[in-house]
């Protein structure tokens, strides 16, 4: 072995020459993203600036603790980066305190639980079946194992959040924590009403805005900052940053508890390269262009929902106020799993999703979830989403008529044509 080959940081040690297998897989994934329509509601396309920060030399730095209070030396520059991320996040959501270290939205929620609850305490969250998230008290999740989880649902006629049920369950069970948020709910959430209910029973209110955070930052969706005791979010999805989590609050005492819960409670060293990418994304979200983008995200979702309705598809709640569009396939007697597989073969990626009070298993489902954030980033406009709705309908009709292979091939050609007009990276 030569001296040069022993030095892993030499200038010739790029990914392609070092590990061609991983390099080729990444290149194939890039080609997939370029040639397919990404309609998964939790996905987006991060900017090159965000990805450059995430792939930076900050990967090498260990920095247990918080700015100015690290357990390692040599942290003066990563302190600068983390402070920038905190300052920008607080400005973005009009809050006083923030922790940008959680590795994910799930860990951000776990930090809240660790700071406010003890095992056996009662929590109240939206049922997974009705659009909630695993960390909101679902049985398979630790939040459903460590705590007494009470689940609220949606109205069986409108599929809107049943706030009267939320209040009834809160008064009956006296939860210590109420969670307002969702992973598959397309409409506005009444955070003010949630806080009123929390006040009646002396509960903390957690607003999990993982899906809506970018829209909230841009003023396109109601903000919980005035009402929630604590706010958690991911930093990708509509916020268009790296994959990660954050926790925010206006209460200094709660902030101190959260700080201790994140470190040393749940995590050791923060991912400083990811925090740098978060800081970049927050700066991008503070720009006027981000407001224009977010407005288009919602407009495009409304067009997609209306166009799918025009094809006779049942849209949960009848429309959307966000980036999310939920389709109920029960009238077509189709399963979500079959439809998403056919769509993927045609170059359209989305996810199967349970619809309210679904009797199918989560691995099968009776519905589809679409999101418009990624393809709006790509540059698609209303007319393009109307065309996408037509293509989705063609796939569904192909399944009904039994000629899916031919339809998938034709749709795939159209998808590739759309993608070629809107190149990425």
Curated annotation (Swiss-Prot):
EC number(s) from the headed UniProt entry: 2.1.2.1
Compartments where located: Cytoplasm
Keywords noted in UniProt: Amino-acid biosynthesis, Cytoplasm, One-carbon metabolism, Pyridoxal phosphate, Transferase
Xref: Pfam families: SHMT
Record-linked InterPro entries: PyrdxlP-dep_Trfase, PyrdxlP-dep_Trfase_major, PyrdxlP-dep_Trfase_small, Ser_HO-MeTrfase, Ser_HO-MeTrfase-like, Ser_HO-MeTrfase_PLP_BS, SHMT-like_dom
Catalytically driven reaction(s): (6R)-5,10-methylene-5,6,7,8-tetrahydrofolate + glycine + H2O = (6S)-5,6,7,8-tetrahydrofolate + L-serine
Family matches, as PANTHER family: SERINE HYDROXYMETHYLTRANSFERASE, SERINE HYDROXYMETHYLTRANSFERASE 1
UniProt similarity note: Belongs to the SHMT family.
Biological role stated in the UniProt entry: Catalyzes the reversible interconversion of serine and glycine with tetrahydrofolate (THF) serving as the one-carbon carrier. This reaction serves as the major source of one-carbon groups required for the biosynthesis of purines, thymidylate, methionine, and other important biomolecules. Also exhibits THF-independent aldolase activity toward beta-hydroxyamino acids, producing glycine and aldehydes, via a retro-aldol mechanism.
Protein name: Serine hydroxymethyltransferase
Gene: glyA
């Amino acid at each position: 072995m030569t001296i040069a080959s022993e030095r892993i940081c030499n200038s010739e040690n790029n990914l392609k020459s070092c590990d061609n297998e991983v390099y080729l897989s990444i290149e194939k994934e890039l080609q997939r993203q370029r040639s397919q329509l990404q309609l998964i509601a939790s996905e987006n396309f991060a900017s090159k600036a965000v990805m450059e920060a995430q792939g930076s030399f900050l990967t090498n730095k260990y920095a247990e603790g918080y700015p100015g209070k690290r357990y390692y030396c040599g942290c003066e520059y990563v302190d600068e980066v983390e402070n920038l991320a905190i300052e920008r996040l607080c400005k973005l959501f009009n809050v006083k305190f923030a922790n940008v270290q959680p590795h994910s939205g799930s860990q951000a929620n776990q930090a809240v639980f660790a700071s406010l609850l003890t095992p056996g305490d009662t929590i109240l969250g939206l049922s997974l079946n009705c659009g909630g998230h695993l960390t909101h008290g679902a049985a398979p999740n630790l939040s459903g194992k460590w705590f007494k989880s009470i689940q609220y649902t949606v109205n069986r006629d409108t599929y809107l959040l049943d706030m009267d049920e939320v209040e009834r369950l809160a008064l009956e069970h006296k939860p210590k924590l109420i969670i307002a948020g969702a992973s598959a709910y397309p409409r506005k959430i009444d955070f003010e009403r949630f806080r009123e209910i929390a006040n009646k029973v002396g509960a903390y209110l957690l607003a999990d805005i993982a899906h809506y955070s970018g829209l909230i930052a841009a003023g396109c969706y109601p903000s919980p900052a005035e009402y929630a005791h604590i706010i958690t979010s991911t930093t990708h999805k509509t916020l268009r940053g790296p994959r990660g989590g954050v926790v925010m609050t206006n209460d200094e005492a709660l902030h101190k508890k959260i700080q201790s819960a994140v470190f040393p409670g749940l995590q050791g060293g923060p991912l400083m390269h990811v925090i740098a990418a978060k800081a970049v994304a927050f700066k991008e979200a503070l720009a006027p262009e981000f407001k224009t983008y977010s407005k288009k995200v919602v407009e495009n979702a409304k067009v997609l929902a209306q166009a799918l309705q025009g094809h006779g598809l049942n849209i949960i709640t009848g429309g959307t106020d966000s980036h999310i569009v939920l389709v109920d396939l029960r009238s077509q007697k189709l399963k979500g799993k079959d439809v998403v597989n056919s769509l993927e073969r045609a170059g359209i990626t989305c996810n199967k999703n349970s619809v309210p009070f679904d009797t199918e298993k989560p691995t099968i489902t009776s519905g589809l979830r679409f999101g418009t954030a990624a393809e709006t980033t790509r540059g698609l406009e209303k007319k393009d989403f109307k065309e996408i709705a037509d293509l989705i309908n063609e796939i569904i009709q192909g399944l009904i008529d039994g000629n899916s292979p031919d339809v998938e091939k034709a749709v795939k050609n159209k998808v590739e044509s759309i993608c070629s007009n809107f190149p990425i990276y």
